[in-house]
Amino acid sequence: MIEFKLQSQCFLHHWNNYPEERGLLFTVNNNASDSYQGAVMKAMGVVAGVSDMVYLHPSGAMLLEFKTPKGRQNDRQVWWQGQVEKAGYRYIIIRSFDDFTALLDR
């Protein structure tokens, strides 16, 4: 499964099964369509490497990165994960639908 399909499957599962939490799991749109848009987004605060989604779970914020089983983080993603964890937040790499549902069951 490719990353965007996994992310979509997980989001829809959460949306449909946890209606009381709607809006607490959301995507971070940090992909510019061209260099001009990229410059505008950077000036507005877009940071390279941020996680794919933010989950404002009742037990605390979690930053979720979706990767295929063989997918690897790039250098900026590794750096950002370190920043997140130093600040005391949870950064979780989701590699399967089962990883995601296990997270919800915590």
Model features per residue range: what roles?
Residues 1-106:
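Catalytic phosphate/metal-binding cores of nucleic-acid and nucleotide-processing enzymes, i.e., regions
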